[in-house]
A protein has these predicted regions:
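Catalytic domains of carbohydrate-active enzymes that cleave complex glycans
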Residues: 175-181, 191-193, 205-351
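Catalytic-core regions of glycoside hydrolase
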Residues: 1-224, 319-350
Length: 351
């Protein structure tokens, strides 16, 4: 049942187990043991236990999952983790809390449980700053770890168009809550958000403005200097404005639609704010001419270059995929080893 839930839980692996059903908890722990046996020798410093995105149960005995079935599962799982990794620190992730219920009930339940002394082994709580306000406005009885969305933002497939620098957003998310945070976990799904990772790490360590970090990045990774450096820096900053887009198929404008079901036709990727696309293209293309062959072929530069070229070509071609854009997409697939990836991470190279 989904009593009180506004969305179905994600179930894309179809292996969800309800811990409230007979034998369910035992089976979950059995599977976790198999995983822990494989990674025991890795000796990680931290293990993070998350309620979502895969997993969870919304039956009446488990709901609300994040503060009921999930917490009960954590309490059973932590002793098993300790058998294999006695010194590891345990973090509890609150990612997607409230997404499926539309309320703060899961945050409230975790707050109450920790206040009562449950989950004493939990060292940190992990909270997403884009969408979750509750943990940053209440005493959660544990220090918070920052979990900014640096990957799955503004475009689908994320990373499918090259680099996705988000300097303004990254700095905003840090500045809003920096006094409430003990550190961060800028999780990513590939190398394309590399600039965002570096921005966040420098904010965590040195409180350094994003623009200064990008300038350092361009000097260190590509050896840029002088006027070229400043023009490329401006282009990278502007890529945040030109990132947001939707893809469109015949009769469809829905980035969450299964592409394999749409059939043949025009492949369109409509950039919401294209005004600076050609200036970005020129700055990156001009800089590319002055780079050494080694730097020009580096993965980090290629992802910046391809993003600039793809966006400009799309605008020239009324946002439709032509042969040139298709070739750029194929280069991203090769560079990032996405041949067997899914639709949310693989550029649209299908017919």
């Amino acid at each position: 049942g989904h009593d009180g839930y506004i969305h179905e839980l994600n179930d894309h692996y179809h292996v969800e187990i309800c811990p409230s059903r007979p034998g369910g908890m035992e089976l979950i722990l059995e599977y976790r043991r198999k995983m822990l046996e494989v990674f025991a020798q890795a000796r990680p410093d931290y293990i993070e236990i998350g309620a979502y995105d895969e997993g969870g149960c919304s039956c009446r005995d488990c709901a609300p999952w994040g503060c009921n079935g999930f917490l009960r599962t954590c309490e059973k799982l932590i002793p098993v983790i300790r058998e294999y990794m006695p010194d590891v620190k345990i973090n509890i992730s609150m990612w997607q809390f409230g997404t499926f219920t539309g309320t703060d009930v899961e945050f409230e339940g975790v707050e109450k449980a920790l206040k009562e002394g449950r989950l004493s082994e939990c060292v940190y709580l992990v909270a997403e700053p884009q969408y979750a306000k509750y943990p940053f406005e209440h005493d959660m009885h544990r220090p918070l770890i920052h979990f900014p969305e640096i990957s799955m933002y503004g475009a689908v497939p994320w990373g499918g168009y090259g680099a996705n620098p988000l300097p303004g957003l990254m700095e905003k998310l840090w500045r809003e809550n920096e006094d409430k945070l003990e550190g961060g976990f800028p999780y990513c799904e590939g190398i394309y958000p590399d600039i965002n990772e570096v921005i966040m790490l420098r904010l965590y360590r040195d409180n350094q403005p994003a623009e200064d970090t990008i300038r350092e990045y361009l000097i260190y990774e590509f050896g840029l200097r002088g006027e070229t450096l400043e023009k490329v820096l401006s282009a990278i900053m502007d890529m945040e404005e030109t990132l947001e887009r939707t893809f469109e198929f015949p009769g469809v404008c829905n980035e969450s639609t299964d592409r394999s079901a749409q059939g043949a036709g025009a492949h369109r990727y409509i950039i919401a704010h294209p005004r600076k696309v050609f200036a970005i293209e020129k700055a990156i293309a001009d800089a590319d001419k002055g780079l050494s062959e080694e730097v020009r072929k580096s993965i980090r530069w290629q992802l910046i270059y391809l993003r600039a070229m793809i966006d400009a070509e799309l605008v020239r071609n009324h946002y439709e995929r032509n042969e040139k854009v298709l070739e750029y997409f194929k280069q991203i697939v090769t560079i990032c080893h996405l041949e067997h990836s899914g639709m949310y991470t693989k550029p649209d190279i299908e017919a």
